[in-house]
Amino acid sequence: MARLVGVDLPRDKRMEIALTYIYGVGRTRSQEILEATGIDRDLRTKDLTDDQVTQLRDYIEANLKVEGDLRREVQADIRRKIEIGCYQGLRHRRGLPVRGQRTKTNARTRKGPKRTIAGKKKAR
């Protein structure tokens, strides 16, 4: 099993797919990496040579921000928005959707489970 930037890549998948297991690398970026390093995208992870693994590792570390570094940067950006008090920061602080989605209905993932409020009793 090849290990790149702290992630074990699945052995039986094509390299194009296996690289997407790294946080910060999607399909397009994985294709760019393989093209830049000259590795066939249809090659399986288990068929990689040690030289190819080293080549991939060096390219990713030199050119991309992935895994822990990327997560830290995203968290720092969110913290900065909260500190400066911009609208997006307020939405983050309140645990509401940040990008303009509706909240009258939906947004349950962000808001959490419903908190039922007792309504009026029926008049007789």
From Swiss-Prot:
Signal peptide interval: none
Disordered, as annotated region: 95-124
One of the record's GO molecular function terms: structural constituent of ribosome
InterPro entries the record matches: Rbsml_uS13_C, Ribosomal_uS13, Ribosomal_uS13-like_H2TH, Ribosomal_uS13_bac-type, Ribosomal_uS13_CS
Gene3D superfamilies (alphabetical): 1.10.8.50, 30s ribosomal protein s13, domain 2
Protein name: Small ribosomal subunit protein uS13
Family affiliation: Belongs to the universal ribosomal protein uS13 family.
Superkingdom of origin: Bacteria
Subunit-structure text: Part of the 30S ribosomal subunit. Forms a loose heterodimer with protein S19. Forms two bridges to the 50S subunit in the 70S ribosome.
Function: Located at the top of the head of the 30S subunit, it contacts several helices of the 16S rRNA. In the 70S ribosome it contacts the 23S rRNA (bridge B1a) and protein L5 of the 50S subunit (bridge B1b), connecting the 2 subunits; these bridges are implicated in subunit movement. Contacts the tRNAs in the A and P-sites.
The keyword Glycosyltransferase appears for this protein: no
Keywords assigned by UniProt, alphabetized: Ribonucleoprotein, Ribosomal protein, RNA-binding, rRNA-binding, tRNA-binding
rRNA-binding as UniProt keyword: yes
One Gene Ontology biological process: translation
GO cellular component: cytosol; small ribosomal subunit
